[in-house]
Amino acid sequence: SQSGTLVNDSAAAIGDTTITMDDGSLFQVGDILEFGDASNVPSTSGAPSGFYYKVTSISTHVLTIARFNSATGKTETGGLRHAVVDNAKILRHWEFYFQFDGPPTTTDDVSAAGGSLDEMHIVVVDEDGGITGTAGEILETFAGVSQANDAKDASGNSNYYPDVIYRTSSFIYWVDHISTLTDGSAKKGTTFDNTVGDAFVVSNTSLTGGTDDFAATNA
């Protein structure tokens, strides 16, 4: 989650479905937001919170939002449930925040070796409904996997994310690291994580390179 970004909108009223930010580049379509007040970040100090909104589109600094039901994982009709003041602080969550117990930080194994920030959560989604019939359906998740090529889980198995995907995924294989990740370094003393320029950016990859197999023919 990311906190502290400010609203730049003096007229964000109940029912509004758009709201202007200081910097729209810090958000992505799919983000889940909570709005606080001008003094406090939501969920940390009693500021207005508990109402969630999903970003459905972005135009420079203007976000289009929809109410989000964290229990069902679905959007609902209606805009803001309460007026949001200018300079209100925001708590921003990843689109799949509610699929995991908490944000990724450092795995226990890497921490014990003096490393940090290796942990990742990965979600595989049926983007267009071609597998399940429902676009956006979650196919599988991988919680707490590591960027460290020698990381182990609590059972002593490799926790290196390419190995976990190869061993347990029913839908994908790993091919290469994305450009902003530390490329499979050893865990001892290594600080992992995204590069600074992408610190708030969620990595999304659409699997568009495949083709349907050929139709079966007689041998």
Predicted regions and their residues:
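Surface-exposed assembly/interface segments
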Residues: 1-219
